[in-house]
From Swiss-Prot:
Protein's cellular compartments: Secreted
Extent of the signal sequence: 1-19
Keywords per UniProt: Amidation, Cleavage on pair of basic residues, Disulfide bond, Knottin, Neurotoxin, Secreted, Signal, Toxin
Chain positions found as Tryptophan amide: W77
Paired cysteines (S-S): C51-C63, C55-C72, C62-C76
Disulfide bond keyword on record: yes
Identification of the protein by name: Conotoxin PnMSGL-01
Entry comment describing in which tissues the protein is expressed: Expressed by the venom duct.
UniProt lineage: Eukaryota, Metazoa, Spiralia, Lophotrochozoa, Mollusca
Source species: Conus pennaceus
Sequence similarity: Belongs to the conotoxin O3 superfamily.
């Protein structure tokens, strides 16, 4: 095999080794993100049907109900 062929094979080997290290880092990051997603809790809101129905007209969610006053928002936080 010529010197040029050996250099090309060496270069390909180095490129392969570098890309495999990068993939391992991405895999670790994906696993870490998956663990964080599993730890999150979902908040279940309990409001009356009247509140839900009044907010449906505005295409929003009933986030809070206080003495018959409904808080309708696109997204409920906290």
């Amino acid at each position: 095999m010529s010197g040029l062929g050996i250099m090309v094979l060496t270069l390909l080997l180095l490129v392969f080794m570098e890309t495999s290290h990068q993939d391992a880092g991405e895999k670790q990051a994906m696993q870490r993100d998956a663990i964080n997603v599993r730890r999150r809790r979902s908040i279940t809101r309990r409001v009356s049907e009247a509140c839900e129905e009044s907010c449906e007209d505005e295409e929003k969610h009933c986030c809070h109900e206080n003495n018959g006053v409904y808080t309708c928002l696109r997204y409920c936080w906290g």
